[in-house]
Every structure is written in C-alpha cells, then in structure tokens.
Amino acid sequence: HDNLTLSVTLKSDASIRNQVVASVAKALKCSPAFPEDYESLKKAFRNPKLQMVSFTITEKGYATAPKYVQDDIPKGPEKCSTVICMVTALALERFKAGAFPFAFVSMDNCSHNGEKLQKGVMEVANAWKKLGFVDDGFIEYLSNPEKVSFPWSMIDKITPRPDGGVAKMLSSLGFEDTEVVVTGKNTWIAPFVNSEECEYLVIEDSFPNGRPRLEESGIYMTDRDT
C-alpha cells in the first residue's frame, strides 16, 4: 500500500472521519537477515543529526527474561535477531561512529515505559560486556542521560483490532482491498486502522540532541514529575 494507511475515526456523535496517513516515508526490516535494510538502519544510527528513535513494540518487546532473548544475547551485536538486542546493536553503531547523543522514546501504553526500555537495553549491553563484545565506554555512553535518554511517555487512544464492519463500510465507499489478515501469531492487520476520537500523547521533554517540534502536532511535552 505504498506505506499509506487509512485512519478511520469513530466519533462520539456516530459519524466517521476517514483520513489517509502518509507520514511513513520508508519501511525497513530491522534484522541482519535483510542486510540491505539493516545497513540502511545502521547508516541512520551513525548520522549525527539523528534526534530520536521511537518504539511501539508492546511491553513484551522490552523483556530480556524470555528464553529466546537469552539465547539471542550470546550471538552478539552482529548476529542477534530479537528486537531488544538489535536496537542495542544499533546504539552500538552510533557509539562507534562518535558517541553522538539521541533519545530512545518508548510510546507503548505501559507504566514507566522509558524505564522498561532502558532496563532492557542495559541488560543486553552489560551481558555483551561480560562476553567481550563491548567495553566500558559503551556502558558509560548508554548510562549518561546527556548522551542517551529514555524519556517516559503516556498515551491514551483506544485502537482495537481491525473491525469487519468497518471494512464493509469502506468497501461500500469504494475503498479497495480492505481484507483483514490474521497472521500465524494471531496479529490482526489491515490497510486501515479504526480508533476512537479521544486521544493524547504526553512525552517527557528529555532529548539530548534536540527534537522535532512535536508540540505543533498536539503532543504534550513536560518533565517527568508532571
């Protein structure tokens, strides 16, 4: 779908607003199994101008306790395949390129999300240090909030899985290819997203390399205490 998504907002007055979301410039597979895509991501992380990397990978994505993550850690930064290991490997790329500052921003709807992301990254990095893959300098880089920050955020927007009724409504309007697909992992995907009207996103304003003007998009920027 050319990285386009149709946002279907179900409003409180029973009306519906359809809007094409065209903010995704490019989609890449974050995995060494796809070397061309992965090299593009490495290049992005080596860019001194990179300001933030955001996450919506669910709370489970930050965990290091599962066996598949524990089995992945000893493979090291060059051969790992789990999300938390790969993002740590990409941070290592940035460290090696010049230890440039940036922010890792979790936008998953869970309490202390930035802390969970930081914990996962640090656990992987410390394990790699014990295994000889990284040195103290990398640990110090990740531990310095003036270099790498892990802002907390809070989001509220009910976005249920794609609804068959919405798909039929879109088809009646002439919108093509509305099929809802259920993957082998029971993930529901579709070329549209149906959601409620009420929404907000609050982010801790901790960005060591600067940030886009997020407040101009309606995002609330504040400190952690607030």
Regions found by a protein language model. Give the residues of each.
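Substrate/ligand-engaging "lid" and interaction regions
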Residues: 1-226
